[in-house]
């Protein structure tokens, strides 16, 4: 899966040291709402432009009338066995939140939890090097970090970015009539579960890895299109979950064309083998009441937790051609997967 600098014994498989995998480790939206319901008095700062209120991808702090600072963190347990690749994926996923706001990353620090009595330090070194590789690809330094002795391997980054406030994109600012586009196919949770269940064929091992290692750098350019009204990345809550956040924040309903949702190669084959991650069921349990009646097949795709997934874009009809041209120029299939409308039903997402 990678050109790791050190060859590991065949007996070391990182996914066997964790109970979860990637963004599928995320606490469910329902439980997270309980955790974040603070009992303390409300404290506000007028310069905090984006905080917890909108469940956005990162926090944004206004430095002056022109520039804002973006701050985010993301970490998880191994989603692949190879340590270098795990570190690279975890870092790519963390950096994505900066691009999802329309910003540019400027620095990162590492977060490492390591079972020092179970796994050699040399393995952790490869994980950190994978993270360093992703940072280099994003043009930033891995400037430091913090580590603890932990029962399971954990790795990720805290990332700082900057943004011209005129380019800032949020997940709750979509408008009725916007078209929906997705920059990466769905199915990462299915394929990584196939690996964990030892069903993944060797010739398919690169499919999810290549997708997860692809930086969402295009987000910085997408944000410069004035007709892009909302932007977010699709990660652990699945396409349906992150689309719901977009709908609920803007008080809109999404008309989603299920058959247009792009899927990773072989995802349907492994889905037929029962490779459904636990995160899929947790996701549906958390927000299924806001969805139309779904078949098990539809649930498995729409609620599939993504790790380092693509960007979900809401763009006006007037700016759609500009977005399509940009996606084409970056060799991303410009497939419209739906639209946003003024609500006419109780469900926030309807299928057609």
Curated annotation (Swiss-Prot):
Gene3D superfamilies listed in its UniProt record: PurM-like C-terminal domain, PurM-like, N-terminal domain
This protein's UniProt keywords: ATP-binding, Kinase, Magnesium, Metal-binding, Nucleotide-binding, Selenium, Transferase
MF (Gene Ontology): ATP binding; magnesium ion binding; selenide, water dikinase activity
Obligatory cofactor(s): Mg(2+)
Entry keyword annotation includes Magnesium: yes
Purpose of the protein: Synthesizes selenophosphate from selenide and ATP.
PANTHER family associated with the record: INACTIVE SELENIDE, WATER DIKINASE-LIKE PROTEIN-RELATED, SELENIDE, WATER DIKINASE
Quaternary organization: Homodimer.
UniProt name for this protein: Selenide, water dikinase
Organism: Shewanella baltica (strain OS185)
């Amino acid at each position: 899966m990678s050109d790791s600098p050190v060859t590991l014994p065949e007996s070391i498989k990182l996914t066997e040291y964790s109970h979860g995998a990637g963004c599928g480790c995320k606490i469910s939206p329902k439980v997270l709402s309980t955790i974040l319901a603070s009992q303390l008095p409300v404290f506000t700062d007028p310069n905090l432009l984006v905080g917890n209120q909108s469940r956005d991808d990162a926090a944004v702090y206004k430095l002056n009338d022109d520039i804002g600072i973006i701050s985010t963190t993301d970490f998880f347990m191994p989603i692949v066995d190879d340590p270098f690749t795990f570190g690279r994926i975890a870092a790519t996923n963390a950096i994505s939140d900066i691009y999802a706001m329309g910003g540019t990353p400027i620095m990162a620090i590492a977060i490492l939890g390591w079972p020092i009595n179970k796994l050699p330090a040399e393995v952790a070194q490869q994980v950190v090097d994978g993270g360093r590789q992703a940072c280099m690809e994003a043009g930033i330094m891995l400037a430091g970090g913090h580590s603890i002795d932990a029962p399971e391997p954990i790795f990720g980054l805290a990332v700082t970015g900057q943004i011209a406030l005129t380019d800032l994109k949020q997940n709750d600012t979509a408008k009725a009539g916007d078209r929906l586009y997705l920059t990466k196919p769905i199915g990462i949770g299915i394929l990584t579960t196939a690996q964990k269940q030892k069903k993944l064929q060797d010739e398919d091992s690169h499919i999810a890895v290549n997708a997860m290692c692809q930086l969402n750098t295009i987000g910085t350019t997408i944000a410069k299109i004035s007709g892009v009204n909302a932007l977010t990345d699709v990660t652990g809550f699945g396409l349906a979950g992150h689309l719901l956040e977009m709908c609920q924040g803007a008080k809109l309903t999404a008309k989603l064309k299920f058959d247009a949702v792009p899927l990773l190669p072989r995802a349907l084959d492994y889905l037929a083998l029962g490779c459904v991650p636990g995160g899929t069921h947790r996701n549906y349990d958390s927000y299924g009441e806001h969805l139309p009646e779904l078949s098990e097949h539809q649930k498995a795709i729409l609620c599939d937790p993504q790790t380092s997934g693509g960007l979900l874009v809401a763009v006006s009809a007037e700016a759609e051609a500009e977005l399509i041209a940009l996606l084409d120029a970056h060799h991303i299939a410009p497939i419209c997967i739906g639209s946003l409308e003024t609500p006419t039903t109780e469900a926030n997402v309807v299928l057609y």
